[in-house]
Amino acid sequence: MNFSIDSNMLRLALILIIAAFAATANAQEDDLLALLGEEEVTDFTYATFKVNRIINLHSVENTARGVLDIKISHRFGFLNSGISDLFGLDQASIRIGADYGITERLMVGVGRSSYEKTYDGFLKYKILRQSSGAKTMPVTASFLATTAIKTIPFQNPDRENYFSSRMYYTFQVLIGRKFSESISVQLSPTVVHRNLVRTSSEANDVYSLGAGGRLKLTKRTSLNLEYVYVLPNQLAPGYRNSFSVGFDIETGGHVFQLHFTNSTSMIEKGYIAETVGNWLNGDVHFGFNVSRVFTVN
């Protein structure tokens, strides 16, 4: 699913959104506390999102310090593959990962995907925390750096191939705000660097803007939406922007994320720069993420 957006309009929209975050976050002094002469405290915002992924995109949430988060992500084939493939259920790709919270602000993670036999790792650091009271901060912000290594054989083994050609890097700033107990929104400006591209018409550095949102439906369920807009003239014809919709279901120590997406890959270099599915043609995957946390320290 692609939408045509003028770059200047995009910049203006970003400025307006950030300004809206700041405007809605101005804290009012508590008259009662002032009368009593009590010191005002800082109240930090928690659970902007339920887990550290919206669907594909990382969220501003971190795995807590000393907690190990085991994730299993499953992506079936396209729904339009027909009854012979049981609408995609006969095809599947999987990613198994482990995230760990080193501190309350710093987390790391590793994973392996069956799609293109890719290994990935990341580091995420929380820069700002949304808060009100004595110290006011309108948003939560994090920095994410990832790397991925594709291990499938080179398509042309007769030429000189380099190990560095298998490498991909992603740098992302996550800016999120919890507007109420029910509504959270996040923006994710991103650059994906690819050491090797297939054609000269493709850019090694791919710039994009991800946007995600969460609508809490009940105490344990929520509706999530996610869209990644890739700026024009960076990818070869046929690639599309990633769009996903899903539901989070919390059951004790597990969180199930059920979703539909036109992206096959479950890591940044793939769903941002390599999505080919067209929602209008039924090129949509059903998939799920399962998260189970363990306190190890």
Predicted regions and their residues:
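Charged helix-capping and loop-helix junction motifs
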Residues: 203-208, 239-243
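Extended, charged alpha-helical interaction scaffolds
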Residues: 196-197, 201
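N-terminal signal peptide c-region/cleavage motif recognized by signal peptidases
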Residues: 22-24
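Sec-dependent signal peptide hydrophobic core
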Residues: 10-17
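N-terminal secretory signal peptides that target proteins for export/translocation
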Residues: 1-9
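Surface-exposed extracellular loop regions of Gram-negative outer-membrane beta-barrel proteins
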Residues: 92-94, 209, 214-224
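Transmembrane beta-barrel domains of Gram-negative outer membranes and organellar outer membranes
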Residues: 28-159, 167-171, 176-187, 191-195, ...
